[in-house]
UniProtKB/Swiss-Prot annotation:
Catalytic class of the enzyme: transferase
Subunit description: Homotetramer.
Cofactor(s), names only, from the UniProt record: Mg(2+)
InterPro entries linked to this entry: NDK-like_dom (IPR034907), NDK-like_dom_sf (IPR036850), Nucleoside_diP_kinase (IPR001564), Nucleoside_diP_kinase_AS (IPR023005)
Subcellular location: Cytoplasm
Pfam families, sorted: NDK
Name used for this protein in its record: Nucleoside diphosphate kinase
Catalytic residues identified in the record: 115
PANTHER family: NUCLEOSIDE DIPHOSPHATE KINASE (PTHR46161), NUCLEOSIDE DIPHOSPHATE KINASE DDB_G0292928-RELATED (PTHR46161:SF3)
UniProt record similarity statement: Belongs to the NDK family.
GO terms classed as biological process: CTP biosynthetic process; GTP biosynthetic process; UTP biosynthetic process
Primary localization: cytoplasm
Coiled-coil positions: none
Gene name, Swiss-Prot/TrEMBL: ndk
Organism: Campylobacter jejuni subsp. jejuni serotype O:2 (strain ATCC 700819 / NCTC 11168)
């Protein structure tokens, strides 16, 4: 069974839409195999988004991700990576299809409500970043 990582970002946590977002996952066949609410440190955010270190938005992304708590979860199901990405919608909420998480809950391309792994390989890396094996069930 495929697994993917999801992060409900600070903007969506602050808006109080955690339950609505989790319901989208579950009602579309994704099981929550693990979940926790965390306040990322600057170092954690920098390490998690290290792939973007040379990009002009890196500093703002890190600052945003540490601006409040996030909800990190492992979603499990058939085609979990692609299913989650379809549910999230385009990175820019203005381009996201109606009914997607970002179209419904995101504020901007920066405060875009959710993160999801973009491949099985990255899902494995991202899951290991946040979860110990005994936390996944």
């Amino acid at each position: 069974m495929e697994k993917t990582l999801s992060i409900i970002k600070p903007d969506a946590v602050k808006k109080g839409v955690i339950g609505k977002i989790l319901d989208r996952f579950e009602s579309n066949g994704l099981r929550i195999a693990a979940m926790k609410k965390v306040q990322l440190s600057k170092e954690q955010a920098e390490n998690f988004y290290a792939v973007h270190k040379e990009r002009p938005f890196f500093k703002d992304l890190v600052e945003f991700m540490i601006s409040g708590p996030v909800v990190v979860s492992i979603l499990e199901g058939e085609g979990a990576v692609l299913k989650n990405r379809d549910l999230m919608g385009a990175t820019n909420p203005k381009e996201a299809k109606a009914g997607t998480i970002r179209a419904d809950f995101a504020e901007s391309i920066d405060a875009n409500a959710v993160h999801g792994s973009d491949s099985l390989e990255n899902a494995k890396i991202e899951i290991e970043f946040f979860f110990k094996p005994n936390e996944i069930c």
